[in-house]
Amino acid sequence: MRDFSFADDVPTAWTYHRATARWLFNASAGGESPPVRPGREDGGLPWTPLPEGAPLQSSLADTLRARVSCRCFAAEPLTLAQVATVLRASYGSDNRSGPVMQDRPPPSGGGLYPLEVTLLVRAVDGLEPGVYHYVPAADGLEQVQQLVLPRPFLTYLFMGQPWVAEAAVVVVLSFAGGRSLTKYGDRGYRYALLEAGHTMQNLNLAVAALGLGVVNLGGFYDDELAVLCGIDVDQELPLYCCALGRPAADPSDRMAMRALERGTPDG
C-alpha cells in the first residue's frame, strides 16, 4: 500500500494550498487595511431588534464537556432570547473599539471581521419562518425573505443530512471577500476559514452552555444555498453552517442519541 500524496491523491486541495503558500520571494507584510464597514446591512428590510439574551451560567469546564454533536432535535421552538445569546457569543459586536472596528469574540486577521451570519429559521418564538441576516453593529436581524422551509428541501440542500430538516435554525457563515482579500491577497482566504472555525466553536460552546443541541455542517450545495440566503457569490461565499435546536435527548447521553438516530427506543 503506497503512502498518501497530496499532489497525487487530492490535486485540487494541493494546488489551492500551494497557491496561497508564502516564501521569501512572495512574502509581504500585506497591503493597507481598506476602509471597512462593520458588516453588510441591506437597509429597508423588516427589522427585529434582539432582546436581552438567555443567561449563560455553565462553567467553561462543564461547557467543554457538554459540547457534542446532536443529530436528533425535538419538535419545539427556540426562544428569541436563546438565539440572541448564541449570535452575540459567536459574532456579536461589543463596540469596544468604537463604531468602525466593532470588536467581536473570535480572532480575526487584521480585525477586519469578514464573515456574515445568515439564519434559516424554522421554529423560533417571535420570528416568522424564513431567512434572516444578523447585523452585529445594530444587534438585530434583517428579514431577507419570509418563507416556510420544507423539510425535503433542507435535506436536499444539505446533501441528504435529514437532521437538518428537524432543527429549529440553520446558521450560515459566509465570507465577504473584499474585506480581507484587499489587504492580504489570496492568503486572506485561509484567514477567513480559520475565522469561520473560531466563530463556529464559540457558537457551539454557547449552545452547549444553554443546554441546546447543535451539529456542524460542511456539506451543502454552495450556489443554491447562496441564492436562498440572498448573497452574490461574486462577492460573498458560504463557508460553514450548523443546525441547532432543542435536543430530543441529552446530547451527552450518547447511547440515547444513537438510539434516536436509528429510530429505535433506548435500551
Feature-to-residue mapping (PLM):
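Short pre-catalytic strand/loop immediately N-terminal to key active-site residues, enriched for Gly-Thr
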Residues: 186-195
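Short acidic/His/Gly/Ser-rich catalytic and metal-binding motifs that mark active-site loops
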Residues: 179-183
